[in-house]
């Protein structure tokens, strides 16, 4: 089978793209690159453009570079940079990208031993994937489905790292929207007893509890939620639940 290899951009064009990127003119750099449809960029320029685009929250450049240059050539991208790109994609509503960044990172690192740094990167990429799903399906899927995605990504992390409500603002917001509906309130409480997946991390259920407590109307409902939780679980870390109760001014013993 004949393989067609794209030629690299000329030195002059490369210099202009690089200069625009370094000067923070990402729209100009992207426009120049778009004009080079039949050419490819070298890895150094690719990483420079991605790093500048992430620093300047230029989602158009990130998306274009990803689909036109990284994915077709399966080029490695440094994990920390992927995290920065994912953060931009999340808040610029390029909500399919974080899952692709995570998949790419996992594929690129599948055959090597992981380090503490690798674990931190995977945590962050998974966290942003969960947040992107919650943000993108804020009004269109039930809380149970969002919770299932959370468990699939976060509860299965090696080492069972602490999972804190403050790190999942989109998930927390989605809980609030869901709990405005009567049927979703009942479904949320039911999650304390019937889990869609086996729970591995002791911090997972307390995060769900804290998210529900953050949105219940008042102390009476909070006491009921705590009672429901305690019927099924003992000895789990309730730090976030205690913080939420304190922030909301409820006088409840946890």
UniProtKB/Swiss-Prot annotation:
GO molecular function terms attached to this record: translation initiation factor activity
Residue ranges the record marks as coiled coil: none
Alphabetic keyword roster: Activator, Membrane, Mitochondrion, Mitochondrion inner membrane, Transit peptide, Translation regulation
Transit peptide feature, positions: 1-8
Highest taxon of the lineage: Eukaryota
GO biological process: mitochondrial cytochrome c oxidase assembly; positive regulation of mitochondrial translation
Localization (cell): Mitochondrion inner membrane
Membrane topology of the entry: Peripheral membrane protein
Residue numbers spanned by region Essential for PET122 function: 185-254
Principal cellular location given in the protein's record: mitochondrion
GO cellular component, one term: mitochondrion
Remarks, miscellaneous: Present with 468 molecules/cell in log phase SD medium.
Reported function: Required for expression of the mitochondrial gene for cytochrome c oxidase subunit 3 (COX3). PET122 seems to work by directly interacting with the small ribosomal subunit to promote translation initiation on the COX3 mRNA.
Protein name (database record): Protein PET122, mitochondrial
Encoding gene (name): PET122
């Amino acid at each position: 089978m004949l393989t067609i290899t794209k030629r690299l951009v000329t030195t002059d064009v490369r210099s202009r793209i690089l200069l625009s990127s370094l000067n923070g003119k990402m729209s100009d750099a992207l426009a120049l690159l778009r004009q080079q449809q039949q050419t490819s960029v070298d890895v150094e320029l690719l990483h420079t453009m991605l790093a500048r685009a992430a620093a300047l929250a230029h989602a158009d450049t990130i998306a274009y570079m990803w689909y036109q240059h990284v994915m077709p050539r399966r080029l490695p991208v440094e994990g920390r940079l992927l995290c920065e790109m994912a953060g931009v994609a999340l808040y610029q509503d390029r909500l399919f990208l974080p899952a692709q960044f995570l998949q790419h990172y996992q594929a690129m690192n599948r055959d090597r031993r992981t380090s503490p740094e690798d674990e931190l990167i995977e945590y962050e990429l998974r966290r942003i994937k969960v947040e992107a799903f919650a943000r993108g399906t804020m009004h269109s899927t039930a809380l149970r489905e969002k919770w299932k995605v959370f468990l699939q990504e976060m509860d299965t992390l090696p080492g069972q790292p602490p999972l804190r409500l403050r790190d999942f603002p989109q998930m927390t917001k989605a809980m609030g929207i869901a709990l405005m509906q009567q049927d979703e309130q009942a479904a949320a409480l039911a999650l304390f007893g019937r889990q869609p997946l086996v729970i591995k991390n002791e911090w997972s259920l307390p995060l769900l509890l804290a998210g529900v407590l953050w949105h219940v109307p008042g102390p009476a409902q909070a006491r009921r939620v705590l009672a429901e939780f305690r019927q099924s679980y003992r000895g789990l870390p309730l730090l976030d639940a205690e913080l939420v109760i304190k922030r909301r001014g409820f006088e409840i013993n946890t």
